[in-house]
């Protein structure tokens, strides 16, 4: 199939991937497959441990189960198709491309607001520990979980509908390894200024609102920690937040680098590195970040294993 067409709209797209070299493609295939398997194992393991251990049935771990679910889904939307493209055909249908983009934007937006909900939960746990169960009732937890999914769906719907109205009559070659907004906008043969502005406003609002919420929560948390007299108390309070803060820093750092800039500044190569982190690497890192530094998760794993041995 040729990269140039005379149609009013293309039937499919060609994803160029990350490299033209067969040796590099095979190395990337093995690396991404390993990362994806670790992602599956880590996130499914986190879901099972929290589900099986009653002591982890708290708001904090309720949010963490949804983070694992989103990361698992997030990675599955992109990685399997990327692996297939590295080995076989790099074609993707018009419908398949926009479906992938819809799921990607939906899950990415939901994760942004979920991280905000988790920050508020940490604020309630550290700043008002005696009233934590009153501040975080089940109804509020459900609202803080439902909100990110609803907003994510609405943002993604508006995003994809606005882009689907564009015409792609010139080239069908996407210089990326998955269907992301910037490289697809670059293919349109119609004016994209209004669509770009809409997407920029949506992405900017999502990042800014969630970041402001997270920042406000952590300013209050830091203020409370500094008032704690004992060193051990400060360390314990800080340890409950450091995992979330590390995850937030990595996730938002790559997101801001990629999306809060105009499409004309999109750079082939440079702007393909950051998406590898937030679509493939971060979903693998989150279970490690939230479990390796978390004594409660480690103890829960030991209890689950002991119960399994005792039942034999």
UniProtKB/Swiss-Prot annotation:
Disulfide bonds join 97-189. One of its GO terms (molecular function) is olfactory receptor activity. Glycans are attached at residue 6. Keywords: Cell membrane, Disulfide bond, G-protein coupled receptor, Glycoprotein, Membrane, Olfaction, Receptor, Sensory transduction, Transducer, Transmembrane, Transmembrane helix. Residues 48-55, 121-139, 218-237, 293-312 are cytoplasmic. InterPro entries: GPCR_Rhodpsn, GPCR_Rhodpsn_7TM, Olfact_rcpt. SUPFAM superfamilies: Family A G protein-coupled receptor-like. It is a multi-pass membrane protein. Signal peptide: none annotated. The chain crosses the membrane at residues 27-47, 56-76, 100-120, 140-160, 198-217, 238-258, 272-292. GO terms for cellular component: plasma membrane. One of its GO terms (biological process) is G protein-coupled receptor signaling pathway. It is found in: Cell membrane. Residues 1-26, 77-99, 161-197, 259-271 are extracellular. Odorant receptor. Belongs to the G-protein coupled receptor 1 family. This is Olfactory receptor 8H3. It comes from Homo sapiens (Human). The gene is OR8H3.
């Amino acid at each position: 199939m040729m990269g140039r067409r005379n149609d009013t709209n293309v039937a499919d797209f060609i994803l160029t991937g990350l490299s033209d070299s067969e040796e590099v493609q095979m190395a990337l295939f093995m690396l991404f497959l390993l990362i994806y398997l670790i992602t599956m194992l880590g996130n499914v393991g986190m879901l099972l441990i929290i589900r099986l251990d009653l002591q982890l049935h708290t708001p904090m771990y309720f949010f963490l189960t949804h983070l694992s679910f989103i990361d698992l889904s997030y990675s599955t939307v992109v990685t399997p198709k990327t692996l297939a493209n590295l080995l076989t055909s790099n074609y993707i249908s018009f419908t398949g491309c926009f479906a992938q983009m819809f799921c990607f934007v939906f899950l990415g937006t939901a994760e942004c607001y979920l991280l905000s909900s988790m920050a508020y939960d940490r604020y309630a746990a550290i700043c008002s520990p005696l009233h934590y169960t009153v501040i975080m009732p089940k109804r509020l937890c459900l609202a803080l979980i439902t909100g990110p999914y609803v907003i994510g769906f609405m943002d993604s719907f508006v995003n994809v509908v606005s882009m689907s109205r564009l015409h792609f009559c010139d080239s069908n070659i996407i210089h990326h390894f998955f269907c992301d907004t910037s490289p697809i906008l670059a293919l349109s043969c119609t004016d994209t200024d209004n669509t770009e502005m809409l997407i920029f406003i949506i992405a900017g609002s999502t990042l800014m609102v969630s970041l402001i919420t997270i920042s406000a929560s952590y300013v209050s948390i830091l203020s409370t920690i500094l008032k704690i007299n004992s060193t051990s108390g400060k360390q314990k309070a800080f340890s409950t937040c450091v995992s979330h803060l590390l995850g937030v820093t990595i996730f938002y750092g790559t997101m801001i680098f990629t999306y809060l800039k105009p499409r004309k500044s999109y750079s082939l190569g440079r702007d393909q590195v950051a998406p590898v982190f937030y679509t493939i690497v971060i979903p693998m890192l989150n279970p490690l970040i939230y479990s390796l530094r978390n004594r409660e998760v480690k103890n829960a794993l030991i209890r689950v294993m002991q119960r399994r041995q005792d039942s034999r």
